[in-house]
Amino acid sequence: MKKKLHPILKKIPLVCATCKKQHVIDTTVENIHIEICANCHPFYVGKQNFTTVAGRVDKFNKRYQNKVK
């Protein structure tokens, strides 16, 4: 059999950016970044989490609401 054929697996901590929960996985890469995991994803949790980010129209209205009055 050939030696050094298979990549070396190592355990790395994987931290969710949303809920900050840490998962340990086996992988060949050095680091992995995830934005959302199964613990906080609305599909798996069963409820909607709204993170309100102002859209372009909201930013425009907020900027010019004092000038109209």
From Swiss-Prot:
Entry keyword annotation includes rRNA-binding: yes
GO molecular function, one term: rRNA binding
Pfam families documented for this protein: Ribosomal_L31
Domain of life: Bacteria
UniProt keyword terms in alphabetical order: Ribonucleoprotein, Ribosomal protein, RNA-binding, rRNA-binding
BP-aspect Gene Ontology terms: translation
GO cellular component, one term: ribosome
Family (UniProt): Belongs to the bacterial ribosomal protein bL31 family. Type A subfamily.
Function: Binds the 23S rRNA.
Subunit and partners: Part of the 50S ribosomal subunit.
PANTHER family documented for this protein: 50S RIBOSOMAL PROTEIN L31, CHLOROPLASTIC, LARGE RIBOSOMAL SUBUNIT PROTEIN BL31C
Protein name (database record): Large ribosomal subunit protein bL31
Gene: rpmE
